[in-house]
Amino acid sequence: SAGLGKLVAPYKIMVSGYSPGGMVGLYSAAFDERIQAVATTCGFGSMRYDAHGIQTEGIKRYSHLRPTIPRLGFFRGNEKRIPYDFHEILALIAPRPAFVLAPKLDQDWFYEDVEVCVKEAQKIYDLFNKKNNIVLNSPNDFNRFTPEYQELVNNWLLGVATAE
């Protein structure tokens, strides 16, 4: 970092991720307050209500297919008993800025579930009088990380970095 000089701002740490990386970004921001903003693209839905079966594999994707959260496997068939969900992860990030890019035709995450999570988290942002700090962008598209999506995310992060 010595060569980067003034380009490195340790008080402006932001994270961004696509798909599982988007989920990891949310967890990171929720539990590390040094992270000032997070952007997630196609990164989450509801764990409690993601029991849609064959199309998404439900919570099995976390516990068996890509075992990022293996203990969720204990809740297969009892998803409503999962002790937390992504609206609560988003609420832990509040009032810091969060950008959620969730295409409406995502084959892995049901847009309606993402929308519910964001709306629930919005209530916490409202308590902080920071309702504009959580943004849901929902293009009529599929789960992918196109150059256009990358530009949307990067422009949002740049806007957060230069705001004050």
Where are these regions (language model features)?
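Conserved hydrolase catalytic core segment
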Residues: 30-36
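Gly/Ser-rich "nucleophile elbow"/oxyanion-hole loop immediately N-terminal to the catalytic nucleophile
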Residues: 1-19, 35
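Glycine-rich nucleophile elbow surrounding the catalytic serine of serine-hydrolase chemistry
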Residues: 17-27
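Conserved strand-to-loop "acid loop" that flanks and positions the catalytic carboxylate
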Residues: 94-112
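Alpha/beta-hydrolase-fold catalytic nucleophile elbow
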Residues: 16, 41-42, 101, 139
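C-terminal catalytic histidine-bearing segment of alpha/beta-hydrolase fold enzymes
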Residues: 118-164
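Mobile cap/lid helix-loop segments that gate and shape the active-site cleft of serine hydrolases
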Residues: 40-89, 110, 114-118, 126-131
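Short, conserved active-site loop motifs that form the nucleotide-linked donor/cofactor pocket
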Residues: 13, 98, 133-134
